[in-house]
Curated annotation (Swiss-Prot):
Gene it is expressed from: PMS2P11
Keyword Glycoprotein appears in the UniProt entry: no
Keyword vocabulary terms for this entry: Kinase, Transferase
Organism encoding this protein: Homo sapiens
The protein, known as: Putative postmeiotic segregation increased 2-like protein 11
Gene Ontology molecular-function annotations: kinase activity
InterPro entries: HATPase_C_sf (IPR036890), Uroplakin-3 (IPR024831), Znf_RING/FYVE/PHD (IPR013083)
Superkingdom: Eukaryota
Note: Encoded by one of the numerous copies of postmeiotic segregation increased 2-like genes scattered in the q11-q22 region of the chromosome 7.
Family of this protein: Belongs to the DNA mismatch repair MutL/HexB family.
UniProt KW Cell membrane keyword: no
Length: 270
């Protein structure tokens, strides 16, 4: 039933990238059993401190032992004779919450829980509410019933996810992993030049986002170089040579259902 005016002894647990029993230890840093960070520490390490009424109980994802319900109200309304209810049926109805105090409100700093007391408005202190009885949530703030769902809560409306604009898509595609559109055009033009083209036509649709077409009058790879070019991916790295259409033709050859064959002289398209 303590007043949580002092800082949590586990304020450093959020700095650890590998939070666990060795990083947290037993509850020896802090005696505030209901501090938010203390609950986090107990969840990570189990509850092994002698100051807790249920030592050794594993904690659930909410930070409480699965066999007990911790609900109290720190402050003047707290009952000093508070006993943990063993079952949900033992939790008193909402009219008795003022005297029995079976719900707790945890004051925390704004950086730990950036939300306001829904009853007090924007000027209220940040709170964390837990419990199961929703019967008095429409009553004045003397009621400590929990909010309808798990917290923490924020007062401002959720921001809608904005679609990525086409310029950003192009910038993403220009990263080191995916070739940019300009690089793709450059490679196709170089392929046409390597194929002996003297006249090259370039067509782009929506700045290359939907279509990139490069056509020229080149004759393609010379027949004597074709077989060596297609087999180069299967050769040792020290034996590979950069021939003809660089790796573009190699990729098409490996992914096609029937191997490409040399074509007679005439206009070619890439």
């Amino acid at each position: 039933m303590e007043k949580l005016s002092a800082a949590s002894g586990y304020s450093d647990v959020t700095d650890s990238k590998a939070m666990g029993p060795l990083a947290v230890g037993c509850l020896t840093k802090c005696s505030h059993a209901f501090h938010l960070l203390c609950l986090l520490a107990m969840y990570c390490n189990g509850n092994k401190g002698p100051e807790h009424p249920n030592p050794g109980k594993p904690f659930t994802a909410r930070g409480f032992p699965a066999s007990a319900t911790f609900q109290t109200t720190p402050g003047p309304q707290a009952s000093r004779g508070f006993q943990n209810p063993e079952t949900l049926a033992d939790i008193p109805a909402s009219p008795q919450l003022l005297t029995d105090g079976h719900y707790m409100t945890l004051p925390v700093s704004p950086d730990q829980l950036p939300c306001d007391d829904p009853m007090a408005g924007s000027g209220g202190a940040p709170v964390l509410r837990v419990g199961h009885d929703h019967g008095c949530h429409q009553q004045p703030r003397i009621c400590n019933a929990p909010l309808p769902g798990p917290g923490p809560y924020r007062t401002e409306p959720a921001k809608a996810i904005k679609p990525i604009d086409r310029k950003s898509v192009h910038q993403i595609c220009s990263g080191p992993v995916v070739l940019s559109l300009s690089t793709a055009v450059k490679e196709l033009v170089e392929n046409s030049l390597d194929a002996g083209a003297t006249n090259i036509d370039l067509k782009l649709k929506d700045y290359g986002m939907d279509l990139i077409e490069v056509s020229g009058n080149g004759c393609g790879v010379e027949e004597e170089n074709f077989e060596g070019l297609m087999m180069s991916p299967f050769l040792p790295a020290t034996s590979r040579r950069r021939l003809g259409l660089d790796w573009c033709l190699i990729t098409m050859g490996k992914s096609s259902r029937r191997p490409p064959t040399p074509t007679p002289e005439g206009p070619q398209s890439a």
